[in-house]
Amino acid sequence: PPVSHARFGIGAVVRHRVFPFRGVVFDIDPVFANSDEWYDSIPEDVRPAKNQPFYHLLAENGDTSYVAYVSQQNLLPDDEEGPVDHPEVDEMFDEFRDGRYELKRELRH
């Protein structure tokens, strides 16, 4: 099956379609690139297809911040339009403007 194109770019702020968290994209895999063990731990009835982009997020919920790995089908644009509260944001991004983060110049390729 064909691989779909990434809907969100580096620095985009997104939220999960089902679970209560949001985050900023810091890396994108064109298709699933995590372990089979990780994939198999997802309940089968909600397990996403592997042939779609997967996003690495600096994520936050009401309680904590963490790194999340999420399929494109489970992400939506964030409508809060505020910055993400994660301690690593300042290490990767410069400013937050117009609802997205600008990647630090030294990290761009």
Predicted regions and their residues:
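A short beta-strand motif that forms part of the nucleic acid-binding face
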Residues: D27-P30, N61
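Mixed-charge, Lys/Arg-rich low-complexity intrinsically disordered regions
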Residues: P1-V13, V18-R22, D29-F32, K104-H109
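Short, solvent-exposed secondary-structure boundary/capping segments
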Residues: F32-S41
